[in-house]
Amino acid sequence: MVDMESPLCPLSPLEAEDLESPLSEYFLQEMGTIQDISRSLGEDSSGSFGFPEYQYLGSGPGSDGSVITDTLSPASSPSSVSYPEVPCGVDEPPSSALNIECRICGDKASGYHYGVHACEGCKGFFRRTIRLKLVYDKCDRSCKIQKKNRNKCQYCRFHKCLSVGMSHNAIRFGRMPRSEKAKLKAEVLTCDRDSEGAETADLKSLAKRIYEAYLKNFHMNKVKARIILAGKTSSHPLFVIHDMETLCTAEKTLMAKVVSDGIRDKEAEVRIFHCCQCVSVETVTNLTEFAKAIPGFASLDLNDQVTLLKYGVYEAIFTMLSSTMNKDGMLVAYGHGFITREFLKNLRKPFCDMMEPKFNFAMKFNALELDDSDISLFVAAIICCGDRPGLLNIDHIEKMQEAIVHVLKLHLQSNHPDDTFLFPKLLQKLADLRQLVTEHAQLVQVIKTESDAALHPLLQEIYRDMY
C-alpha cells in the first residue's frame, strides 16, 4: 500500500492579472456573498408573489390619488367610484417585483387596463378606438401583434384586444381583482416550475455528456488512481522507482516502449523528461477528443478551437495529474509503477524543479476531495475559457463557459452539500494553475537551453508565444 495522506494546505491568493478571467468573476461574486450565506440558509426562500396597484394620477377627479372609472363605462355605473389606495410595501411588494407583459403586444405592462394587463400604447389604442368609434379596414392575415409591429395592422391589433378580454365595461385603472390576481399567481408559479424543470433537465444532460466524455477519453481517472494507490487492486503490487537502479529496471520493463534506443544512452534526467513529454502528448490528444464532446466546441472556428486547447491543455493536465499523486509520489506507466517524490527532488538542476511544484498544487487540490464528475466539469470550464488571447468568437465561447460554470456550481452544491465554500475555493485554483503553467513553460525553456533534451514538435507548438 502507498501512503495516501494528504495534508490540508492554505489557499493561495488570486493574482491581480488573474482577476480579469471570466471564471474569476464568479469567484469574486461568490466571495462577495459569502457573508450572507449563513443567513440565507435560515430564511424562507419560498416567498409569495404580489402585484402592483395602479392609480390614475391625472388632473381633475381622481388627482388626489383615488382611481376613477372609465368615462365610457355604462350609465348604470357610478361616474366616480373610488378605490382605497394601498401603500406600496404594506401587504404587497413594489411594482417592480413582477415583470408582467402586455397581453396584446408583449411589451411591459403599465397596469391593469380595461380588464387585462396592457401597456400604455395598447391601452391608448383601445381607448381611442372605442371613444371615436373607429372602424378599420378588414384584414384576413391574422397578423401577429408584437411590440415592434403593433402599429402596422390596426384591425388585427383591435381584434387581439378583444380576444384577450379588453372591454369598455371594465374599469380603466385600479387594483387587480382578487380572482385575476389568484389566476395570474397560479400561472406564474406553474410557468416557473415548468421552466425550472426544463432548465434542470438541460443542465443534468450537459453534466452527463461531459462526464461520460471524460471517462471515455482518459484512461487514468481518480477512482482508478485512488484504488491503486490504496493497494486495493488484485493485480501485482506497484513497482516503486526510488533510485537509479529501479529507474533502469522500469525502463526495461514498464516503460520499454517509451524509452527508445535513441535516448537510452542519455542521462537519467533527460530520459525522465522524455517520458514526461510522451505522457503529455498522449494527454493532449485525449483532451482534444474530450473538448470535441463539449456542446458547442466543435462548431467553433477552427482557430478558436486550437487557441483554447493551446492555452488550456497544461492547466487541464496538471489538474488531472493531481489524481495520480499523494504526498509521497505519483503513479506512472498507466498505474503499473510509482515514482517517489524524494527521488524526483534529488535529480540534478534544473530537472529537480520540474515536479515539486506539481506536488504542492496537488496536495491543495486533492484536499478539496473532488470526484471524477466534479473534475470533468472543472476541466471543461478550463478549456472553454473566454479570456484566452487571440480568440475570434469571444461571445460564443463565454456563453459556453458560463453554462459549464453554472452546471459546475449546481453540481458541487448537490454533490458536496456540506461544503458551502467549495465552489469559490475551486475557482481560486484557476489562479494557481495559471501560475503553475507559466513557471513550467519557463522551466522547459531552461531545460532546452542547458541540456541536450529535445522537445516534442506538438509541445513545442503549444509553448510557442505562450508566455
UniProtKB/Swiss-Prot annotation:
- PTM info: Ubiquitinated by E3 ubiquitin-protein ligase HUWE1; leading to proteasomal degradation. Phosphorylated.
Q: Which residues bind DNA?
A: 99-173
Q: Which SMART domains match?
A: HOLI (SM00430), ZnF_C4 (SM00399)
GO cellular component assignments: nucleus
Q: Where do the zinc-finger regions (NR C4-type) map? A: 102-122, 139-161
Which residue positions hold the site described Essential for heterodimerization with RXRA? 433
- Name the UniProt key words of this record, in alphabetical order: Activator, Biological rhythms, DNA-binding, Lipid-binding, Metal-binding, Nucleus, Receptor, Transcription, Transcription regulation, Ubl conjugation, Zinc, Zinc-finger
Q: Tell me which Gene Ontology terms the entry assigns under biological process.
A: cell differentiation; cellular response to starvation; circadian regulation of gene expression; enamel mineralization; epidermis development; fatty acid metabolic process; gene expression; gluconeogenesis
Q: Where is this region: Required for heterodimerization with RXRA?
A: 304-433
Ranges for domain NR LBD come to 239-466
- The superkingdom listed in its UniProt entry is Eukaryota
> Per its UniProt record, what Pfam families does this chain match?
Hormone_recep (PF00104), zf-C4 (PF00105)
Molecular function GO labels: DNA-binding transcription activator activity, RNA polymerase II-specific; DNA-binding transcription repressor activity, RNA polymerase II-specific; lipid binding; nuclear receptor activity; nuclear steroid receptor activity; RNA polymerase II cis-regulatory region sequence-specific DNA binding; RNA polymerase II-specific DNA-binding transcription factor binding; ubiquitin conjugating enzyme binding
Location in the cell reads:
Nucleus
Q: How does it assemble?
A: Heterodimer; with RXRA. This heterodimerization is required for DNA binding and transactivation activity. Interacts with NCOA3 coactivator. Interacts with CITED2; the interaction stimulates its transcriptional activity. Also interacts with PPARBP in vitro. Interacts with AKAP13, LPIN1, PRDM16 and coactivator NCOA6. Interacts with ASXL1 and ASXL2. Interacts with PER2. Interacts with SIRT1; the interaction seems to be modulated by NAD(+) levels. Interacts with CRY1 and CRY2.
Query: What is the annotated role of this protein in its UniProt record?
Result: Ligand-activated transcription factor. Key regulator of lipid metabolism. Activated by the endogenous ligand 1-palmitoyl-2-oleoyl-sn-glycerol-3-phosphocholine (16:0/18:1-GPC). Activated by oleylethanolamide, a naturally occurring lipid that regulates satiety. Receptor for peroxisome proliferators such as hypolipidemic drugs and fatty acids. Regulates the peroxisomal beta-oxidation pathway of fatty acids. Functions as a transcription activator for the ACOX1 and P450 genes. Transactivation activity requires heterodimerization with RXRA and is antagonized by NR2C2.
To which protein family does this belong? Belongs to the nuclear hormone receptor family. NR1 subfamily.
Q: What is this protein called in UniProt?
A: Peroxisome proliferator-activated receptor alpha
Which gene does this sequence derive from? PPARA
